[in-house]
Amino acid sequence: MKKLRIGVVGLGGIAQKAWLPVLAAASDWTLQGAWSPTRAKALPICESWRIPYADSLSSLAASCDAVFVHSSTASHFDVVSTLLNAGVHVCVDKPLAENLRDAERLVELAARKKLTLMVGFNRRFAPLYGELKTQLATAASLRMDKHRSNSVGPHDLYFTLLDDYLHVVDTALWLSGGKASLDGGTLLTNDAGEMLFAEHHFSAGPLQITTCMHRRAGSQRETVQAVTDGALIDITDMREWREERGQGVVHKPIPGWQSTLEQRGFVGCARHFIECVQNQTVPQTAGEQAVLAQRIVDKIWRDAMSE
């Protein structure tokens, strides 16, 4: 089988910490090149990772079968549109675009072009979350908290909902089966319109779902708790599993070989996209799944603005 030619757009902090270590460990693909509009900053990064620097987005597209996009959210629509129109498959950081209409237009464009367009919701590929999903058939309650130590501002409410709270909503809805309805919730902002706190309630049949985030909680902790028929399961920071059944408590150790990037789902996410392109299969977070959580976050924001 011909090796897939992979490219990267955007070389900021997330790309360097989470994606380049995975993509540079190429096995059944080749890392062809990278492009960023800030050439002066991009060149040293490309040199340290031994990745060729492309002179333009179009030249990168011409040399690649698929591209990972890690540029700013504001650039997503233009960058992804250009790549899709050039016949290139795309995996892009969430959110798909900075507004819902543009996100839906990108999904429609990918469908017309018969190309793979996937949103990189890495938590869907975190091994412990994947294991939890298989044990929720009898769940009565599912709660996900993702807090920040001190991250109020400088962006407005809409930006923070789309940039960070989106992860919580997408993960919780995916764990529940993705067919939940929004029942209500609370949003608190400061006088500058910056998000302080969010908590929302959903239902999926008998299952009750809660999502929660505080921007100045003094902690970066992320937890998921499931209450099922016969068990209480807690997952902390995607690496600690605590399960109670009757009188017994079970702590599942993380495999020694498992890297932090694998625990957090980045490895699984990248490989899933590449395998879908190679095998011409549909990714988990393509089509409707690519915009499901964004559509709900957009409604949460619109409801808050109308109050």
From Swiss-Prot:
Q: What start-end ranges are recorded for coiled-coil regions in this protein?
A: none
Report the InterPro entries cross-referenced here. Gfo/Idh/MocA-like_OxRdtase_N, Gfo/Idh/MocA_oxidoreduct, NAD(P)-bd_dom_sf, YceM-like_C
Tell me the disulfide pairings in this chain: none
Q: Which residues form the signal peptide?
A: none
UniProt entry tagged with the keyword Oxidoreductase: yes
Q: Which UniProt keywords are given for this protein, alphabetically ordered? A: Oxidoreductase
Which branch of life, at top level? Bacteria
- Molecular function GO labels: nucleotide binding; oxidoreductase activity
State the EC number(s): 1.-.-.-
Which PANTHER family would you find in this protein's record? CONSERVED EXPRESSED OXIDOREDUCTASE (EUROFUNG), OXIDOREDUCTASE YCEM-RELATED
Family membership noted in the UniProt record:
Belongs to the Gfo/Idh/MocA family.
Q: What is this protein called?
A: Putative oxidoreductase YceM
